[in-house]
Amino acid sequence: MNKNFLIAGGVVLAIGLAVAIGVTLVDEPLDGNLPEGETTVNGDFLPEFASENDDNIARGLTAPTFSAPNQNSEIVTIEKNGNAKALIFLAHWCGYCQKEVPVVQQYVDLIGVPDGIDLIAVATSIDRARDNYPPHDWLANEGWTETQLYDLDKEIATAYGLNAFPYWVFLDKDLNVVARRTGNLPQDQVGQLLVALANQ
């Protein structure tokens, strides 16, 4: 048999295997352990957060409504329901987020979320190659008792102006921005912000 024919055949076979493997990798779902469901965002996006001292640009703006899956793949919609909202955007691989979650949960356990406030964790920037994946296992291990939603494609984070973790957005009952914060908040500051929000 012609040597060149054998070489050409081997090249074709190698390419075919590479294509087959490539298709398998591309078609593989993100992860079977992640919640499933469509995320939708409606309304004008908030400007990207710059700093606490320079955030007047967002204060008073109406935040977009959104729907996303919870840890049980049930679609939850965040919209006007008569309650104010405290949203904390978390990345499972973020060390600051890993410190913040138990601080917030301890406050909830000891004092409780004030009446009239929905406290919502939004897991975003999900990466199965990094620490604490999947995020719902991490939150379960931390004993998180409040609503948890999954921003699988970072659509909600983008719409809310996230640029660092952890990222807090406080909304009044009409979904207008009251305050935004980034970084670890001490437990007393978390409490002050929640109480102030309840008194809006």
Features from the language model and the residues they span:
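Structural microenvironment flanking redox-active thiols in thiol-disulfide oxidoreductases
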Residues: 98-142, 152-159
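Short active-site neighborhood of thiol/selenol oxidoreductases, capturing the structured segment around
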Residues: 76-98, 104
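Thiol/disulfide oxidoreductase modules built on the thioredoxin-like
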Residues: 140-144, 151-198
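A short beta-strand-turn-helix
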Residues: 57-58, 65-86
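N-terminal targeting signals for export/organelle localization
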Residues: 1-63
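Extracytoplasmic
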Residues: 61-63, 81-82, 114, 163
